[in-house]
Amino acid sequence: MCIFKLFESMFFHQRSTQAEYFDAPERPVAERLAAFRELDRVNQFFRFEHPFVSRLPSWLGEAHCASLEILDVGAGTGLLGRVLSDWASRRGWDWRFTNLDLNPLPLPREDRARIVAGSALELPFADGHFDLVVASQMTHHLTDEDVVRHWREAWRVTRDAIFICDLHRNAGFYALLGPALRLMGIGSQLRRDAMISVRRGFHRREWLELAARAEISDPKVCIYYGTRIVLQARKSGR
């Protein structure tokens, strides 16, 4: 048993319901932008795109990856879409992103993604509108009931696949994250929210149960290097 599975079995049996300051609706736009810039720095340091670039080509097939319409749910600053689009472009692939967020932020001028304001729980798109629906580290902000709604909607609007990545809830990750963020010089508020985020994260069994409730066919759930949890599923006939 690896150390992260041992810590998972010993601690953090239930998700925390403590709210993050990051989610406070009354925060001024300037403060939200500053927080997202700091969060983007953390995400880049921990290579938040790695589960996507390491798994999508072999899973979907390189021929299928040549051209993709992708929805990023809870896109924030759109950083994931920019990183993945650039990565795909270097391989001669065309990945076109639609960034959905409840409160969209202004994107850099060079960002070609479409921006849509909307809820992950009621996506404003027709059935089967996208080749792929992704979400990165936004699912832990939701209650279990809303996770089911979020995934059911993601499954509805994809014509092929969903790929959801979030935080794995375990004490080993929790113990290592705080010192790492301090060494990076991350501010105290984001550090506190990051620790809450881990406690709001998930175990593999929980995601399998939630995927079943969302009526997702043949879901695959795995733990990624002890820190992240990944749900991937494709519709039948693919």
Explain the meaning of each model-derived region.
Residues L6-P25:
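N-terminal auxiliary segments of SAM/dcSAM-dependent transferases
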Residues P25-R55, W59:
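Class I SAM-dependent methyltransferase Rossmann-like catalytic core
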Residues L71-V73, T77-E122:
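Class I SAM-dependent methyltransferase SAM/SAH-binding core
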Residues V134:
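A conserved beta-strand element that flanks and buttresses the S-adenosyl-L-methionine
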Residues L142-E153:
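A short, conserved alpha-helix within the catalytic core of class I
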Residues R159-L167:
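Conserved beta-strand signature within the Rossmann-like core of class I S-adenosyl-L-methionine
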Residues L167-R213, K220:
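C-terminal alpha-helical "lid/dimerization" subdomain adjacent to the S-adenosyl-L-methionine
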Residues K220-R238:
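Core SAM-dependent methyltransferase catalytic element
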